[in-house]
Structures are given as structure tokens and as C-alpha cells.
């Protein structure tokens, strides 16, 4: 009450902003006579003048009045349309990063030209975001004439365009495209292996058309790129046939004396950590076997750059054969390997071991080897659009969602007054007892309108409901057209003609958005056809166009006299905003119009929220069948129900965003690191830091900091340095031959040895050649580990709500454990990259260059790539649902904290999946 009282005295914030902006409108209007006197060339020259002023540091706000006046004048000359004052207000709201709510027919597309032109002067790019490809193409061509006239370039970003064309589109001053395509381009740019392959030029300023549809309706579902990595099915089978030729070594060897081995062999097993290590003899045996089967060249090493991937498959095959046993670790069911939880004995259907182990077990058992489909990259619209330096949006219906726009995106909603006051009559809802009665009443209304010639738009909430109306109208013999929001270009033509006298058009709520319904029909397409007809003389063209427009004026006045466009809806949507969008199709630019909702007590929304209450009223009034209840209290109770649903949906979206923000922070780190690697000319400092960290982590496992010599485990350290890092060091001899040596000196010796071995490789082929190889190794490892990390996060997210039963806050638990998973990801990248670079054997620059190219082509050879995007309703189409690759996470709790983790990572359980338990 007090708030309303103060608003009446001081005005709302919306009123105060409009008052402030109207002062600028006066300034813009004052410039109009001056710009009218300028020639075309003088107008174009203004653009260059503005660009130079911005480049010198002048703010866009200081140029705004002159720039808006220039665009208005250009539009008058090229488009034959003059911006209304309210469109100038809308343009200012968009420039200042707000959401402009402008009713249907108020000219949002033309309004956007003002801030688009102004912000394009900075040279940093402007992205105009539309809901479908048709609108992107239409608006780019339509408004592109104006931008080109003013000296700016325009690009269109469409799906399946060649990379060069996309790059050209993004290099333009202004780029038009769909929300999905901008998001997918961002993800693809963070999957490239060459800096010059990126298409986007930065995220400066975006104007989102139909902002409510994109940032709210489609915000529940992320954009997902998924696919299958390179197909190695034949290689898994071959490795399974070769590993029986390798013999297990028995006994533990002393690295100094060689004693302790009871039988020499090719590999040793560490059953506790589920790891396999090749011996020196094993490397020679593997090289001989690979050469005999044509997998490597005669005399080549398994650690040559081109052959390094073979070792990955060999280790997977050895682990599958010797460490994973049927009916203990897995069972075979229906031609599939199903993992057994070794603590509970339960089958873990749908889970798959990672790093090629599952495929190796499939090859061992002779079942079909399944190519694993993984999420390669993913982002929500909420997090993508928040990456822009400045974001704005426009729609006909945003005020009902103003709180969500402010809360999630930090966007203020500003209601722009119409150019002419609305004359639409929004009638009270009619509520019937049954659906049958509801449809019968709606059809009677449609027939009455058709008989008097009044055009009707029938709105439905689903394709199923539109088909019911279609059948009923066909039975009545009423001619009509049906739209279902799939064929955007055709729909735009039909919707444009829905205002003709006697027309009946059935449309789902989303169909034909972005196209005005003009009373009497739209003649612009016919006018364009006449203008394009070269067979006609100039005079004939003018005469035909004049006759066409005169005929349209007669039709227009006729339909206005009949009451304008009639909106008939057969169900309330769960969002008031969608209902308002439907109503907004009628009564554009001060035209007459009317709307009515026909409801049944068994409609979903009524049944759940308001059915019992309204039914009780009907029963008390003893209303006969076929009679409707029409009362303000009913309409208000329905709107109250809609508010409840909207609040619930907002809570869902906000909760999803809070979880996704965790992944988003990690995504930013990974993508930033990836871009730095792509752009860096020298990676030696990064690699050196990673190598030192790895050596420190390894040494500190066996030679703890500030520890006594008696606590050191030098034999195991020597063994691991030799088998995993190809570093042979006599650390025990060093200690025995020295009077006193500290743990830090041991660490320094290992670091120096690792640096010397690494520098020798670099010197052999040259720093420049080795840098490109380092880049490929880093990028490939980042991508592989990030894909596995996305799967791990998805698995963590699925079960995190159960923590609530343990009196823990699931959201906080998710943040904590996701951070730990991310730390492990960074550690794995560090270890894998360093290990590969330390063990690879290079002979020549040519060999290294070829290896880098092979790695790049392998990394990019993703099969069955699927692009999953939200549909118009914010739901994922079932046919495009991503099949997430999943990591093995044991669910038992009886493993010892200091035992090796059963997942096979080699880490202690408390440092690995024990953190997830």
C-alpha cells in the first residue's frame, strides 16, 4: 500500500527512466532537419567521423543523439520507414543494456537498428540473436540495406556454413544469427587445434530478440556437442590377440643388483593398484611383436612419436587380461560387459570403464566393441550470454519475468509505451465443465466470426490440441490453415496473411513469432514481386503498386470495422507471458481486436491448481451442461495458479544455474588455459613448471619433506623413475656415498636429471619444432581429461541430492567435490603430458612434425557428432539426447582409506574416490 502511494507521488523507476530518455529524444528530433539536408555521401561520411571519435576515446553515449538521428534519416531514405519517438526510447534502453518490452507490432526489428549501429562504431562487433534461421536471414537482408547504406558491413551466421564464411560473418561490423549457432560456435572455438581456426572475434555486445524465449524458456537445457572418439575397434581386437605372447615376470627386482627375480618376463603386475608395468625385456618384445604384425616399422621404437598411442592400447589389453576377471569384476550379459560393484556385488548397468579399458575387456570376451559416445563440450544459454561485455534484449512480454531477468542476468526490464494506445478487448475467461463443451463453444465462436468475415487466430498450447481443433473445424466445413512452429519461412508468409477477412488460422503458441499480423493482409511481398519484374516499365510498376495498396486499404478498413483480429485460445499456458504473447498478436499499432480463452475443468492447469474450487462454485450454482462460468474471480484464480507455476519454474532454473555455475567456473579456467596454449609462441616455461611439479609429487611420495633417511623408500622411487619416466638414477648409491644428504638434495637431483633428459630431446630436433608437438600433446590431453571430467560431474550431480538424507547441504557438497575432481583433472593433465614428453623418443624434426599432425587429425576425428539444443519449449528432443560417457565410481564403503582406489587410478582411496563417498 505504502509502495503504491509513493509510486503515485514520485513515479516508478520505469517512469523516471522514460522521463530521462525523453530529454535525449528532444535532442535527436532537433537534429532531424540538419540531417535531412545532407546528401547520401555526407550521411555515409558521418559513420567514418563517428568511428574516429570513438577511436580517440570519446564515449558512445556522447555520440548517441547524432548516431540515432543518422540511422533515422538513413531508414527514411532506404527503408521508407521513420523511427517513432517510442522506438528511440527503446533503442536507448537496448544501448544501456536493458530489456525493452515493446508490444507486438511496435517495430522491434527497426528499433534494434539504433543501438546496433551505435555499438558497431567501436569496431568490436555486435551480435543480433534471433530464435530461428529464417528470422536471422530475413532481418540481416532487410536491415542490411540500411547498415550498408551507412557504411557498415553485415554478416549472417547460419548452421553448416564453411569455416571461412563463418569467420567472414564474425569479422563484419554486425552479425545476425541464432542463439544455438552462437553458442555452438563458442564451444567449437574451444575445441580447435590451430588458433587461426577460431571463428568468433570476441563477445562484445549482443541484442537478443524474443529474449524471454531464449533466456527463460530455453534456459533449462544446455547446448551439448557430443560424439564418438576415433574408432579403434580393430586395434583392440589385435592387441587382445598379441598380449598372450607377453610373459609375466615373477619376483621383485633390486634395481642395483638385479636380484630377486624368480623368472624374467615382459611385465609386472601391481594387483593392489590395478596397474601394469613393462620391463626392459617387455619393451623389446612389444617392439618385435608390433613390427611382425606391421603395426610399427622394423627397428622403430614403441616410444617414437607416431607409435606412442599403441602403448596406451597395449597397457589396456594387459590390464583387461590379467587384472580384470569375469564374474568377479564384470559379467557378460546380452552381448555387453556389465561392471560388478566388487563391494556390494551389484551390477552397474550403464557404467563403463574409461581410458579404453572397457573396450579392451569387450575384445577379450569377444562381444561387440561399443564406440563410446561422450559429451565433448557443453554450456547453458544462461552462462553463454553472461560472457558478453554488454547484453540487451527485446520482447513483447518481459514484465512478468522482470525479477528473473534481474536476478539471473542482471538485466533491468523497461516497459516502452506503445506508439498508439491499445484498443484490444481482452474478455474474461469462459470455464466449462468438460473439454468437449469447451471445444464446442470455441468452434461456435469461430463460426460466428467467419460468417461475418472477421479474421480469427486460434492459439493452442500443443500440436496435439491444434490437431483436435483442425478436425473439429474440418467437420464443420470451415476453411482454415494449421501451423506448428516447424517450417519457419512458410509460416511467416501464412501468419502475415492471417489478418485477411474471413481467414481462420490455427497456430501453436510459438508459430510465426517475429511476423506481424496486418489487418487486411500483408501486401509487401506482392509489392516486392512487382518491383522485381523487369518486364514492366517504371510507370506500369508504379500503377500496379498504387492499385495494390488502394485495394489493401479497402480490405484494411473492412476488417477494422468488423472488430479486427479475433484471438481464441483453447487452454491457458502455465506461463502468463505465453498467454500475453498470444493476445499481443491482435491490436497492433492501435488497431481494434479482441481475445477470449475457453477453458475446461479437466485442463492440466485447472485440474492441478484451480479445478476443485471452480467446480464447487459450478455445483453450488447448479449450472447445466454446456453453460460456462464467466467471472473475474475465476480469471484471477487462474492467474494466481500461473504465478505459482512460474515461481516453481524460476526456482528450478535458478537451482540448475547454481549447479551449472560450478562447471562454468571450471570451464572458463580450461578454455582460458587452452586459448593461451593456442596463442603462445613458446611453451617451455609451462612445460618446465609441470615437469617440476610432477617430479616433486613423485619424490615426496617416497622421500617426504623434512624426513629422516630411514623413512625414505629409494628402491621404489628408482623403479618408478625408470619404468614410468625413462630416468635411470642410482639414488641409493648416491646416498651411501655421501656423508649427509637431505631430502631437498634428492629432489633437486631428480629435477635436474629430468630437465637434462628433456632438454636433450629438444636439442635433438630444435625448440621451434618441439613447441608444436608440445602444443598438440597439451591440447589433446586437456580435451580428453575435460570430456572425462564432464562425465564425472554429471555422475556426481545425479546422486548428490541423496546427501540431504545425511543432514548435508547437497549444493555445498557438490561444490566441494566438484572442486576436488577439478584438482584431480589438473593433476592428471600435468602427469600425462609430462610422462608422454619425457618418454617419447624423437629422431628428426620431420618425424616430430608428422607426429604432431597425426595427433591433431586423430583428435579432430570425432564420429557421429551430435548437436543438442533446446527446443522452443525448453525441452530436449529425445532423438538428440546426449549419451553421457561415465567414469567408474565404486559405491561401496568397506574399502580401507589407505588402500589403493579400486578404480585403477593407482592413488590411495582417501585421495581418489574415497573423497566422493
Swiss-Prot record:
Annotated residues for binding of Zn(2+): 901, 903, 912-913
Keyword terms of this UniProt record: ATP-binding, Cell inner membrane, Cell membrane, Cytoplasm, Membrane, Metal-binding, Nucleotide-binding, Protein transport, Translocase, Translocation, Transport, Zinc
Pfam families on file: P-loop_SecA (PF21090), SEC-C (PF02810), SecA_DEAD (PF07517), SecA_PP_bind (PF01043), SecA_SW (PF07516)
GO cellular component: cell envelope Sec protein transport complex; cytosol; plasma membrane
Binding site for ATP: 87, 105-109, 516
Cofactor stoichiometry and binding remark: May bind 1 zinc ion per subunit.
Keyword Repressor attached: no
Matching InterPro entries: Helicase_ATP-bd, Helicase_C-like, P-loop_NTPase, SEC_C_motif, SecA, SecA_CS, SecA_DEAD, SecA_motor_DEAD
Subcellular compartments: Cell inner membrane; Cytoplasm
Membrane-related topology note: Peripheral membrane protein
Reaction(s) catalysed by this chain's protein: ATP + H2O + cellular proteinSide 1 = ADP + phosphate + cellular proteinSide 2
UniProt keyword annotation of DNA-binding present: no
Known EC number: 7.4.2.8
BP GO terms, sorted: intracellular protein transmembrane transport; protein import; protein targeting; protein transport by the Sec complex
GO molecular function: ATP binding; metal ion binding; protein-exporting ATPase activity
Tree of life domain: Bacteria
Swiss-Prot/TrEMBL cofactor(s): Zn(2+)
Purpose of the protein: Part of the Sec protein translocase complex. Interacts with the SecYEG preprotein conducting channel. Has a central role in coupling the hydrolysis of ATP to the transfer of proteins into and across the cell membrane, serving both as a receptor for the preprotein-SecB complex and as an ATP-driven molecular motor driving the stepwise translocation of polypeptide chains across the membrane.
NCBIfam families found in the cross-reference section: PRK12904.1, secA
PANTHER family xrefs: CHLOROPLAST PROTEIN-TRANSPORTING ATPASE, SECA INNER MEMBRANE COMPONENT OF SEC PROTEIN SECRETION SYSTEM
Subunit structure: Monomer and homodimer. Part of the essential Sec protein translocation apparatus which comprises SecA, SecYEG and auxiliary proteins SecDF-YajC and YidC.
Family statement drawn from the similarity comment of this UniProt entry: Belongs to the SecA family.
Name assigned to this protein: Protein translocase subunit SecA
Amino acid at each position: 500500500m505504502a509502495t503504491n502511494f509513493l509510486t503515485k507521488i514520485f513515479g516508478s523507476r520505469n517512469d523516471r527512466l522514460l522521463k530521462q530518455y525523453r530529454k535525449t529524444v528532444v535532442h535527436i528530433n532537433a537534429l532531424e532537419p540538419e540531417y535531412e539536408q545532407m546528401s547520401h555521401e555526407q550521411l555515409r561520411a558521418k559513420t567514418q567521423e563517428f568511428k574516429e571519435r570513438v577511436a580517440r576515446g570519446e564515449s558512445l553515449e556522447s555520440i548517441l543523439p547524432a548516431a540515432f538521428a543518422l540511422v533515422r534519416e538513413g531508414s527514411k531514405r532506404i527503408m521508407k520507414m521513420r523511427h517513432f519517438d517510442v522506438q528511440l526510447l527503446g533503442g536507448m534502453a537496448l544501448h544501456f543494456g536493458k530489456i525493452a518490452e515493446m508490444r507486438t507490432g511496435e517495430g522491434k526489428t527497426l528499433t534494434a537498428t539504433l543501438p546496433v549501429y551505435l555499438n558497431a562504431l567501436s569496431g568490436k562487433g555486435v551480435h543480433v540473436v534471433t530464435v530461428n534461421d529464417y528470422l536471422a536471414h530475413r532481418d540481416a537482408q532487410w536491415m542490411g540495406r540500411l547498415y550498408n547504406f551507412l557504411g557498415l558491413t553485415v554478416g549472417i551466421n547460419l548452421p553448416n556454413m564453411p569455416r571461412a564464411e563463418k569467420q567472414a560473418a564474425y569479422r563484419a561490423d554486425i552479425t545476425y544469427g541464432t542463439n544455438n549457432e552462437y553458442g555452438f560456435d563458442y564451444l567449437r572455438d574451444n575445441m580447435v587445434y590451430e588458433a587461426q581456426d577460431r571463428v568468433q572475434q570476441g563477445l562484445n555486445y549482443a541484442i537478443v530478440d524474443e529474449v524471454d524465449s531464449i533466456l527463460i524458456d530455453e534456459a533449462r537445457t544446455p547446448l551439448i556437442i557430443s560424439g564418438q572418439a576415433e574408432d579403434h575397434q580393430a586395434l583392440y581386437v589385435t592387441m587382445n590377440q598379441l598380449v598372450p605372447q607377453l610373459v609375466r615376470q615373477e619376483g621383485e627386482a633390486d634395481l642395483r643388483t638385479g636380484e630377486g627375480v624368480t623368472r624374467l618376463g615382459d611385465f609386472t603386475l601391481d594387483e593392489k593398484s590395478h596397474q601394469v608395468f613393462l620391463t626392459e625385456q617387455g619393451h623389446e618384445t612389444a617392439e618385435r611383436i608390433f613390427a611382425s604384425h606391421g603395426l610399427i616399422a622394423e627397428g622403430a621404437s614403441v616410444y617414437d612419436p607416431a607409435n606412442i598411442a599403441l602403448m596406451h592400447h597395449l597397457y589396456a589389453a594387459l590390464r583387461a587380461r590379467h587384472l580384470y576377471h569375469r564374474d568377479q569384476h564384470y559379467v557378460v550379459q546380452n552381448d555387453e560387459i556389465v561392471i560388478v560393484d566388487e563391494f556390494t556385488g551389484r551390477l552397474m548397468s550403464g557404467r563403463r570403464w574409461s581410458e579404453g579399458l572397457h573396450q579392451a575387456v569387450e575384445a577379450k570376451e569377444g562381444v561387440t566393441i561399443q564406440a563410446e559416445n561422450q559429451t565433448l563440450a557443453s554450456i547453458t544459454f544462461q552462462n553463454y550470454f553472461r560472457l558478453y561485455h554488454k547484453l540487451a534484449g527485446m520482447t513483447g512480454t518481459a514484465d512478468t519475468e522482470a525479477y528473473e531477468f534481474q536476478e539471473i542476468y542482471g538485466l533491468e526490464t523497461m516497459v516502452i509505451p506503445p506508439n498508439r494506445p491499445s484498443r484490444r478487448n481482452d474478455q474474461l475467461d469462459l470455464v466449462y465443465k468438460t473439454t468437449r463443451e469447451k471445444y464446442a463453444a470455441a468452434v461456435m465462436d469461430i463460426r460466428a466470426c467467419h460468417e461475418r468475415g472477421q479474421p480469427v487466430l486460434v492459439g493452442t498450447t500443443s500440436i496435439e490440441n491444434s490437431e483436435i481443433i483442425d478436425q473439429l473445424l474440418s467437420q464443420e466445413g470451415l476453411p482454415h490453415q494449421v501451423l506448428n512452429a516447424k517450417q519457419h519461412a512458410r509460416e511467416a508468409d501464412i501468419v502475415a496473411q492471417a489478418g485477411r477477412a474471413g481467414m481462420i488460422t490455427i497456430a501453436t503458441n510459438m508459430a510465426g513469432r517475429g511476423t506481424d499480423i496486418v489487418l487486411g493482409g500483408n501486401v509487401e511481398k506482392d509489392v516486392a514481386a512487382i518491383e522485381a519484374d523487369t518486364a514492366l516499365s517504371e510507370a506500369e510498376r508504379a500503377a500496379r503498386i498504387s492499385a495494390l495498396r488502394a485495394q489493401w486499404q479497402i480490405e484494411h478498413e473492412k476488417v477494422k470495422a468488423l472488430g479486427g483480429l479475433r484471438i481464441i485460445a483453447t487452454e491457458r499456458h502455465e506461463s502468463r507471458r505465453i498467454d500475453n504473447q498470444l493476445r499481443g498478436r491482435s491490436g497492433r499499432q492501435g488497431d481494434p481486436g479482441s481475445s477470449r480463452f475457453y477453458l475446461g475443468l479437466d485442463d492440466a492447469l485447472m485440474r492441478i491448481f484451480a479445478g476443485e474450487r471452480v467446480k464447487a462454485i459450478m455445483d453450488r450454482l447448479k449450472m447445466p451442461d454446456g453453460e460456462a462460468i464467466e467471472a473475474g474471480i475465476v480469471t484471477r484464480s487462474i492467474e494466481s495458479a500461473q504465478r505459482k507455476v512460474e515461481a516453481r519454474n524460476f526456482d528450478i532454473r535458478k537451482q540448475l544455474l547454481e549447479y551449472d555455475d560450478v562447471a562454468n567456473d571450471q570451464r572458463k579456467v580450461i578454455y582460458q588455459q587452452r586459448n593461451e596454449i593456442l596463442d603462445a609462441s613458446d611453451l617451455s616455461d609451462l612445460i618446465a613448471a609441470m615437469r617440476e611439479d610432477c617430479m616433486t609429487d613423485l619424490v615426496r611420495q617416497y622421500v617426504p619433506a623434512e624426513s629422516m633417511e630411514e623413512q625414505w623408500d629409494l628402491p621404489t622411487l628408482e623403479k618408478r623413475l625408470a619404468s614410468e619416466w625413462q630416468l635411470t638414477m642410482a639414488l641409493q648409491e648416491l646416498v651411501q656415498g655421501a656423508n649427509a644428504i637431505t631430502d631437498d638434495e634428492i629432489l633437486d637431483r631428480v629435477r635436474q636429471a629430468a630437465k637434462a633428459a628433456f632438454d636433450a630431446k629438444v636439442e635433438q630436433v630444435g625448440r621451434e619444432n618441439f613447441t608444436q608437438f608440445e602444443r598438440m600433446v597439451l591440447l589433446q590431453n586437456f580435451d580428453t581429461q575435460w570430456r572425462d571430467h564432464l562425465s564425472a560431474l554429471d555422475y556426481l550431480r545425479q546422486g548428490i541430492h541423496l546427501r540431504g538424507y545425511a543432514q548435508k547441504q547437497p549444493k555445498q557438497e557438490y561444490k566441494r567435490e566438484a572442486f576436488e575432481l577439478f584438482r584431480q583433472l589438473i593433476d592428471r593433465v600435468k602427469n600425462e603430458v609430462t610422462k608422454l614428453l619425457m618418454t617419447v623418443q624423437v629422431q628428426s624434426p620431420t618425424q616430430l612434425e608428422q607426429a604432431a599432425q597425426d595427433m591433431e587429425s586423430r583428435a579432430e576425428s570425432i564420429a557421429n557428432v551430435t548437436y543438442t539444443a533446446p527446443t522452443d519449449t525448453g525441452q530436449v528432443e529425445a532423438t538428440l539426447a546426449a549419451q553421457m560417457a561415465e567414469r567408474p565410481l565404486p559405491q561401496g564403503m568397506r574399502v580401507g582409506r589407505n588402500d589403493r582406489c579400486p578404480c585403477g587410478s593407482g592413488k590411495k582411496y582417501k585421495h581418489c574416490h574415497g573423497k566422493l563417498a
